[in-house]
């Protein structure tokens, strides 16, 4: 960046790098691993837009050697409690579903067993949106060249970025409307409170005036 007081400049290939970072920025991938103690429940939550494909793979490493009847249950639900995927005695597998609304989704692992059993290692890899699409399969079906596949991916990614910005703009408008509505209600309440205080003060003046006249303290 130049030290002069003129407009900001980006020397070298920074615009390309910035565009590349923007395209890679909203990566919709959740890859996580954690230990799950016996007779415990751990949940992960994520907000996902509507009409998006969500895919995932999980693997649960059982270090108990089958002791204590250890079993792990997997359940994926939305904020309304609707079950999108469920698997009892889960060990390793994949899941996929399409969201119907913008919502908070919850992935829960629950371990059940008896005795002293080592913690299980849970590995979860969840993708949605562009990252969930299988472009290799799309290339085979539509007979696309590698460059065409990459252009398709960039097109989908650009559309995803535009949708994210559109959603953020919508949320900003909703929050602004809520803020304006709140300010209006506060203004009306302030005016009402002021009128009540003025009315109460006026009533007190007349009441005290009559009281003092009755006591003949004033004429």
Swiss-Prot record:
Disulphide bonds in the chain: none
Residue span of region Required for interaction with STX17: 1-142
Transmembrane segments: 186-206
Cytoplasmic side: 207-219
Organism this protein belongs to: Mesocricetus auratus
Region (Interaction with ARF1 and IL1B) location: 207-219
Record PTM Dimethylated arginine, positions in chain: 171, 176
InterPro entries assigned to the protein according to its UniProt record, in alphabetical order: Emp24-like, GOLD_dom
Membrane topology: Single-pass type I membrane protein
Lumenal side: 32-185
Signal peptide coordinates: 1-31
Keyword Translocase found: no
Role, per record: Cargo receptor involved in protein vesicular trafficking and quality control in the endoplasmic reticulum (ER) and Golgi. The p24 protein family is a group of transmembrane proteins that bind coat protein complex I/COPI and coat protein complex II/COPII involved in vesicular trafficking between the membranes. Acts at the lumenal side for incorporation of secretory cargo molecules into transport vesicles and involved in vesicle coat formation at the cytoplasmic side.
Protein name (Swiss-Prot/TrEMBL): Transmembrane emp24 domain-containing protein 10
SMART domains: EMP24_GP25L (SM01190)
GO MF term list: protein transmembrane transporter activity; syntaxin binding
GO cellular component: COPI-coated vesicle; endoplasmic reticulum membrane; endoplasmic reticulum-Golgi intermediate compartment; endoplasmic reticulum-Golgi intermediate compartment membrane; gamma-secretase complex; Golgi membrane; melanosome; plasma membrane
The protein's assembly and partners: Predominantly dimeric and to a lesser extent monomeric in the ER. Monomer and dimer in ERGIC and cis-Golgi network. Forms homooligomer (via GOLD domain); the assembly is promoted by direct binding with leaderless cargos and may form a protein channel that facilitates cargo entry into the ERGIC. Forms heterooligomeric complexes with other members of the p24 family such as TMED2, TMED7 and TMED9.
Residue ranges that the Swiss-Prot or TrEMBL entry lists as coiled coil: none
Alphabetically ordered keywords of this record: Cell membrane, Cytoplasmic vesicle, Endoplasmic reticulum, ER-Golgi transport, Glycoprotein, Golgi apparatus, Membrane, Methylation, Protein transport, Signal, Transmembrane, Transmembrane helix, Transport
Cell location: Endoplasmic reticulum membrane; Endoplasmic reticulum-Golgi intermediate compartment membrane; Golgi apparatus membrane; Golgi apparatus, cis-Golgi network membrane
Keyword GTP-binding applies: no
Motif annotated as COPII vesicle coat-binding, chain positions: 211-212
């Amino acid at each position: 960046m130049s030290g002069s007081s003129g407009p900001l400049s980006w020397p070298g290939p920074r615009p390309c790098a910035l565009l590349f970072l923007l395209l890679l920025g909203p990566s919709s991938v959740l890859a996580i691993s954690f230990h799950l103690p016996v007779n415990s429940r751990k949940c992960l939550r994520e907000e996902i837009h509507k009409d998006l494909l969500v895919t995932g793979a999980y693997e649960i490493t059982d270090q108990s050697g089958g002791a204590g009847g250890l079993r792990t249950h997997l359940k994926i639900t939305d904020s309304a409690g609707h079950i999108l995927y469920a698997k009892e005695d889960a060990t390793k597998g994949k899941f996929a579903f399409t969201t119907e609304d913008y919502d908070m989704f919850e992935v829960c692992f629950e371990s059940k067993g008896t005795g002293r059993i080592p913690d299980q290692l849970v590995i979860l890899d969840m993708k949605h949106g562009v990252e969930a699409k299988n472009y290799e399969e799309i290339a085979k079906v539509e007979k696309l060249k590698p460059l065409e596949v990459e252009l398709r991916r960039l097109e989908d990614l650009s559309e995803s970025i535009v949708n994210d910005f559109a959603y953020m703009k919508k949320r900003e408008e909703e929050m602004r409307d809520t803020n304006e509505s709140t300010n209006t209600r506060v203004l009306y309440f302030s005016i009402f409170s002021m009128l009540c205080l003025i009315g109460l003060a006026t009533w007190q003046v007349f009441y005290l005036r009559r009281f003092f006249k009755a006591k003949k303290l004033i004429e």
